[in-house]
């Protein structure tokens, strides 16, 4: 397999899936898109348009089970991931699953158990910040040790507006799930407890949602991480993280790029959403996943990482309503992920 192109099937052709379709077809090497599955036929057809020989299905299982599909990219909503992941594991093919692995820890654990039973890592979770050059540099800097031990991290995660149907719980398991993963990945330790506080809400929040929310994450060694999650901030997409260490600080996600001076004002621009902000990270993620899949492995967050993030999300969702500091319940890490 390592000498020939990876034949990829895409399941879910919405915002993220169609972006990945273009990426597989045009921006990465060693892989081609051979099938797209979405219950919405028009979306599937649009994603496959112009790609010679790319078949279109309305039944996602037909893509996962197609004999000419070597690997799958899963870009359906998180609540639909479990059965699709289990089907890919059953068939023994690699799958890049968009975050979250699943929205709750019980279903995430079932995915981990299926992979453990299969005896090999097939699932990679699409935590793309791990491939962002700024985040990668922050990780290298923290691990090099010149700043001393990390004590605190301050994160801001802002979206211009939440899509219809987005709930308060999704602010945790669909959005803050990124900070749960980056915390574990940057610091190399588990999350032990989560608290959530609610400041005065923006009038732009739909009914039933208070927005923004302030999440506090505690880690095993006692680092505290604050996350402002604000999904209807109105002005654009902004993701920041500042690590405060014994000997200094390091920050990523600040304003950079071109600034202009025009009509008596100066300034730059803010990305409208995750696609331009993390394009380089997504490209790198897909390239490294495809290379690893051809070699029979994964190169990124594992199903275990997705499961640990889901356990933190579950504590976060409970903390949202109780107002209490909520410990994270995480099972022991299976040997497959040592
Ligand atoms: N990494 C990131 O920054 C990032 C950004 C956006 C979305 N995502 C993730 O990507 C996934 C998709 O999000 P989106 O914004 O593209 O959603 P979307 O609603 O735009 O698209 C989802 C698509 O999945 C299809 N679908 C629904 N159920 C299905 C099923 N059972 N089988 C096959 N297709 C099904 C829908 O018809 C739709 O076309 C989610 O897991 C989301 O969290 C990740
Ligand atoms: O699915 C999206 C995506 O993961 C974005 O990166 C995040 O900023 C949004 O909050 C989330 O809803």
Curated annotation (Swiss-Prot):
Homotetramer. The gene is iolG4. Its EC number is 1.1.1.18. GO terms for molecular function: inositol 2-dehydrogenase (NAD+) activity; nucleotide binding. Gene3D superfamilies: Dihydrodipicolinate Reductase, domain 2 (3.30.360.10), NAD(P)-binding Rossmann-like Domain (3.40.50.720). Pfam families: GFO_IDH_MocA, GFO_IDH_MocA_C3. Belongs to the Gfo/Idh/MocA family. Signal peptide: none annotated. The keyword NAD applies. It comes from Saccharopolyspora erythraea (strain ATCC 11635 / DSM 40517 / JCM 4748 / NBRC 13426 / NCIMB 8594 / NRRL 2338). Keywords: NAD, Oxidoreductase. Involved in the oxidation of myo-inositol (MI) to 2-keto-myo-inositol (2KMI or 2-inosose). PANTHER family: INOSITOL 2-DEHYDROGENASE, PTHR43593. It catalyses: myo-inositol + NAD(+) = scyllo-inosose + NADH + H(+). It comes from the Bacteria. This is Inositol 2-dehydrogenase 4. GO terms for biological process: inositol catabolic process.
């Amino acid at each position: 397999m390592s000498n020939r192109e990876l034949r990829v099937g895409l399941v879910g052709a919405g915002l993220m899936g169609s972006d990945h379709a273009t990426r597989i077809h045009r921006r990465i090497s060693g892989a081609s898109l051979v099938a797209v599955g979405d219950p919405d036929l028009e979306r599937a057809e649009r994603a496959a348009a112009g790609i010679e020989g790319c078949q279109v299905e309305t039944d996602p299982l037909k893509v996962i089970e197609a004999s000419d599909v070597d690997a799958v990219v899963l870009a359906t909503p998180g609540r639909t991931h479990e059965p699709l992941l289990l089907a890919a594991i059953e068939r023994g093919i690699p799958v890049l699953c968009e975050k979250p692995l699943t929205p709750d820890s019980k279903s995430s654990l079932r995915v981990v158990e299926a992979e453990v039973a299969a005896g090999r890592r097939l699932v990679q979770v699409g935590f793309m910040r791990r491939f962002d050059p700024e985040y990668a540099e922050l990780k290298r800097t923290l691990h090099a040790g010149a700043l001393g031990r990390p004590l605190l991290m301050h994160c801001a995660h802002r979206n211009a507006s939440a899509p219809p149907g987005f709930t308060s719980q999704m602010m945790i398991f669909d959005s803050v799930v990124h900070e749960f993963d980056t915390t574990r990945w940057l610091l190399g330790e588990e999350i032990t407890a989560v608290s959530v506080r609610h400041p005065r809400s923006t009038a732009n929040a739909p009914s039933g949602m208070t927005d923004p929310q302030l999440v506090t994450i505690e880690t095993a060694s006692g680092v505290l991480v604050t996350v402002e999650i604000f999904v209807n901030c109105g002005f654009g997409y902004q993701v920041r993280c500042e690590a405060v260490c014994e000997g200094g600080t390091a920050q990523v996600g600040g304003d950079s790029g071109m600034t202009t001076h025009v009509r008596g004002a100066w300034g730059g621009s803010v990305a409208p959403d995750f696609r331009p902000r993390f394009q380089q990270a997504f490209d790198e993620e897909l390239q490294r996943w495809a290379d690893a899949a051809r070699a029979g492995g994964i190169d990124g967050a594992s199903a275990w990482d997705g499961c640990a993030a889901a356990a933190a999300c579950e504590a976060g969702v409970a903390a949202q309503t109780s107002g209490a500091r909520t410990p994270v319940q995480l099972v022991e890490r299976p040997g497959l992920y040592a």
